[in-house]
UniProtKB/Swiss-Prot annotation:
NCBIfam families: menD. Its EC number is 2.2.1.9. It catalyses: isochorismate + 2-oxoglutarate + H(+) = 5-enolpyruvoyl-6-hydroxy-2-succinyl-cyclohex-3-ene-1-carboxylate + CO2. This is 2-succinyl-5-enolpyruvyl-6-hydroxy-3-cyclohexene-1-carboxylate synthase. Homodimer. GO terms for biological process: menaquinone biosynthetic process. Pathway: Quinol/quinone metabolism; 1,4-dihydroxy-2-naphthoate biosynthesis; 1,4-dihydroxy-2-naphthoate from chorismate: step 2/7; Quinol/quinone metabolism; menaquinone biosynthesis. The lineage of its organism: Bacteria, Bacillati, Bacillota, Bacilli, Bacillales. Belongs to the TPP enzyme family. MenD subfamily. Keywords: Magnesium, Manganese, Menaquinone biosynthesis, Metal-binding, Thiamine pyrophosphate, Transferase. GO terms for molecular function: 2-succinyl-5-enolpyruvyl-6-hydroxy-3-cyclohexene-1-carboxylic-acid synthase activity; magnesium ion binding; manganese ion binding; thiamine pyrophosphate binding.
Length: 584
């Protein structure tokens, strides 16, 4: 037998088998020649689920979506050259949103590098600081030590991806021709296992008892506190955060991505309209928390970030299992390296029930006043983009997922996704906040989260049209709501809007595309709605039938801006009147 083929088959077979043994059982593959042996072995292994995606950029985000939804590592495989470079945006997003991806790139062997060989470029540390770890795998050799090395390296890389903060890792595989493995080899998947096998087990960072006692003592004398829950908080944070709020009397300012706004838990202390009422000047000047406890990533709301930044006299406690200083407001006074659950559990156990005071009632009262005013937009007949969110939530069934694209959809979700007793998971790509790869990420998530509704703007939709292929290839179920304002709607809310002379050409960027033909090309259904009743009917139909469903609602950017400003102005008047009444 050819010694090269034997080495190739056993070495890469050990690698693939070790992936599945460590529960990395999903791989998104883009076709290519140099990655042939790994792709074939993955397809052959009974423990591996393989998903084809032709476009590497979309493939990267598709894998990201699967990993976000499954909350475990997913592998990506491509050939050498620019194919690997197309993963870059998804890798950046995975790194900053702390999602474990196992990025596998095939490469030319060392003798074909820097000599002008076709489809060869420098892939060493290709993703730079956006991966937690990089390793250049050894050329396959036919001996037990190398098979064991393949497994041990796999263990180390997966452990790195799972270690807090979670994130992507990159393995580069130089491979010589011929590239076809021999599946007739005996014990193809067993080489390198040895008598003992490694286990990658992720634990929780715990709270030192001395710190807990000290913190409990301090908090017991602080009546005015806030609990802020952002993206990527622990999946059980709702239960623990609400218990902590009940003990302390601190309101919970819940970002929509914290998934605390919806569900069957007690939401008495949950504040959902802070993005609107924290714009009020009088409120910002008079409401001064003594302590702010923050879990997860920084919230979407700019108004909340600015409010946090102004609280220079407060104690700011950032709870982060990795100990990283995610503090763009630059106000953190304490960073606690513990899991959200460990932190809450420790305080709940030792914290006495605080005396009821006016602090939490003030927040609850203003929150309800604000929500009452915001709900007036549900009477608007016009195509107001904020109502897109409330009407979707109205028809979503229990256990559904709402995926919000970046730019305006996530901001409208922040403003208009009110508390609900239905379990509705909210997802988004808030690592680097780009508008690329949104369709693909949502489609990846839809493999696990069904039904799933994606809300996306027309430019973001255009940006990832190639991603729709996954819906056709893998027969996925998804409803995509395209809010078509023919351009970049968010720029109307920014200072650039005042530069009328060049606004449309540089920022408004209308592209005037009809997406119906594209959707049909990918085997999906398309409907352009003309009223809110039809909108709700089409969204509901999409969540109860199989396949790709695209619902387009056309809006006017200038009108949408005016309606947002009108609502904000009205809420500010209501809030100011309420605050002035309380001060009398």
């Amino acid at each position: 037998m050819n010694n090269h083929i034997e080495a190739l088959s056993y070495y890469l077979g050990a690698f693939v088998d070790e992936l599945t043994r460590l529960n990395v059982c999903d791989v998104v593959i883009s076709p290519g020649s140099r990655s042939t042996p790994i792709a074939l072995l993955m397809e052959q292994h009974e423990g591996m689920n393989t998903y084809l995606h032709v476009d590497e950029r979309s493939a990267g985000f598709f894998a990201l979506g699967i990993a976000k939804a499954k909350k475990r590592p997913v592998a990506l495989l491509c050939t050498s050259g620019t194919a690997a470079a197309n993963y870059y945006p998804a890798v950046c997003e995975a790194f900053h949103s702390r999602v474990p991806l196992i990025v596998l790139t095939a490469d030319r062997p060392h003798e074909l590098r820097d000599v002008g060989a076709p489809q060869a470029m420098n892939q060493i540390n290709l993703y730079g600081t956006f991966v937690k770890q990089f390793t250049e795998m050894a050329i396959p050799e036919a001996n037990e030590a190398m098979y064991h090395y393949a497994r041990m390296t796999t263990q180390r890389m997966i452990a790195s991806a799972l270690l807090a903060p979670q994130g992507p890792v990159h393995l580069n595989f130089p491979v010589r021709e011929p590239l076809i493995p021999d599946f007739s080899l005996e014990s193809l998947w067993d080489k390198g296992r040895g008598e003992y096998t490694g286990v990658v087990q992720r634990g929780n960072a715990v709270m030192p008892s001395e710190y807990v006692d000290s913190l409990v003592g301090r908090l017991s004398h602080m009546e005015k506190g806030l609990i802020i829950c952002g993206d990527d908080s622990h999946s059980e944070i709702a239960t623990f955060a609400t218990q902590l709020a009940e003990k302390t009397g601190y309101p919970i300012l819940a970002d929509p991505l914290s998934n605390i706004r919806s569900g069957h838990h007690d939401k008495t202390m949950v504040i959902d309209c802070y993005d609107t009422f924290l714009r009020n000047v009088l409120l910002k000047e008079t409401w001064k928390p003594e302590v702010i406890i923050r879990f997860g990533g920084m919230p979407v709301s700019k108004a909340l970030t600015q409010f946090i930044k102004k609280q220079t006299k407060a104690v700011h406690i950032v709870v982060d299992e990795s100990g990283q200083w995610r503090d763009p407001a630059l106000v953190a006074t304490e960073v606690v390296q513990a899991s959200d659950i460990a932190f809450c559990s420790a305080l709940i156990e030792k914290m006495p029930v605080m005396k009821k005071n006016d602090w939490s009632q003030m927040w609850q009262h203003i929150n309800e006043k604000t929500k009452e005013t915001l709900r007036e937009m549900e009477t608007y007949d016009t195509a107001f983009e904020g109502r897109v969110i409330t009407d979707i939530v109205r028809v979503l069934p229990e256990g559904a997922t709402l995926f919000a694209s970046n730019s305006m959809p996530i901001r409208d979700t922040d403003s208009f996704f009110f508390t609900s007793d239905k379990n509705i998971q909210v997802m988004a790509n808030r690592g680097v906040n780009g508008i690329d790869g949104i369709i693909s990420t949502a489609l990846g998530a839809s493999m696990i989260c069904d039904p799933l509704v994606l809300v996306i703007g027309d430019l973001s939709f255009y940006h990832d049209l190639n991603g729709l292929l996954a819906a056709k290839l893998h027969e996925l179920n998804i409803t995509i709501v395209v809010v078509n304002n023919d351009g970049g709607g968010i720029f109307s809310f920014l200072p650039q809007y005042e530069k009328k002379e060049h606004f449309e050409s540089l920022f408004g960027t209308p592209i005037g595309l009809d997406y119906e033909h594209v959707v049909n090309m990918y085997g999906g259904s398309f409907s352009r709605v003309n009223g809110w009743e039809q909108f709700r009917e089409e969204v509901q139909k999409g969540t109860t039938t199989e396949g790709l469903h695209v619902v387009e609602i056309c809006t006017n950017r200038d009108e949408n801006l005016t309606l947002h400003r009108t609502l904000w102005a009205k809420t500010q008047d209501v809030i100011t009147t309420s605050l002035q009444g309380e001060s009398k």
